[in-house]
């Protein structure tokens, strides 16, 4: 990023994304060494119900539906055409919780750096959130960069920054092109009954 400065959340571009209700669709490239995996992700929530889909054409099609009020979740395997149900009121924590560091639940908790980031030949106004986590005992800083076109997010880039034998190593681990962002839930994604009717219920082995 260039022309970087720290800004309060209220002056950030990200303030437009800090909503309990939203729909986000993104084409993603996950980078792991010489391997690149292309996928599409969809997230939509109304603050109570949420829809999350990961689609890797030909390899994976997973959908998770969650209803906070019912304390239930449905995991759909689109490749198999089946789904399972979990009643997580029986668990001390939500079994669907994971460490997905591509999702920020509350931007206001983080220091926000603002500047410009170049994608292709275009420089976009951008906000960056950075936090440190530990991988195999080694601290790694994760930098999440959001590029904006007006008030709408256009790109999301995730970089990992670590120290290797005294040298700083920066790796891009994810590149995402945001194809849709709206500050409301898509009614089609919230219609769980219609979605589940397209799949067969199977018993969860767990």
Q: Which positions does each model-derived feature cover?
A:
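N-terminal leader/targeting segments and the immediate start of mature chains
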Residues: 1-49, 116, 120, 183, ...
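Extended beta-strand-rich segments in extracellular/periplasmic secretory proteins, especially
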Residues: 3-11, 15, 21, 25, ...
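A sequence-composition feature that detects small, non-aromatic residues
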Residues: 32, 69, 126, 130, ...
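An acidic-aromatic
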Residues: 33-103, 153, 159-179
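Poly-acidic low-complexity segments
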Residues: 67, 87, 106, 186-195
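Short, exposed beta-strand "edge-strand" segments with a Pro/Gly-rich flavor and a Y/T-containing core
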Residues: 79, 137, 183-184
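Short, intrinsically disordered, low-complexity terminal segments
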Residues: 123, 173, 180-184
């Amino acid at each position: 990023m260039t022309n970087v400065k720290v800004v309060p959340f209220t002056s950030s571009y990200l303030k437009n994304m800090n909503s309990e209700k939203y729909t986000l669709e993104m084409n993603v490239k996950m980078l792991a060494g010489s391997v690149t995996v292309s996928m599409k992700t969809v997230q939509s929530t109304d603050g109570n119900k949420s829809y999350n889909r990961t689609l890797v054409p030909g390899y994976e099609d997973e959908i998770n539906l969650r209803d906070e009020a019912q304390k239930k979740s449905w995991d759909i395997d689109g490749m198999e055409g089946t789904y399972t149900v979990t009643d997580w009121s029986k668990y001390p924590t939500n079994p669907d919780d994971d460490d997905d560091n591509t999702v920020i639940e509350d931007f206001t908790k983080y220091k926000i750096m603002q500047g410009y980031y170049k994608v292709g030949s275009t420089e976009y106004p951008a906000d960056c959130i950075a936090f440190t986590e530990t991988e195999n005992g080694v601290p790694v800083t994760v930098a999440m960069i959001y590029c904006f076109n007006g008030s709408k997010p256009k790109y999301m880039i995730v970089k990992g920054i670590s120290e290797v034998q005294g040298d700083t190593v920066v790796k891009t681990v994810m590149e995402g092109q945001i194809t849709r962002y709206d500050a409301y839930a898509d009614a089609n994604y919230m219609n769980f009954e219609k979605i589940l009717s397209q799949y067969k219920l199977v018993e969860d082995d767990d």
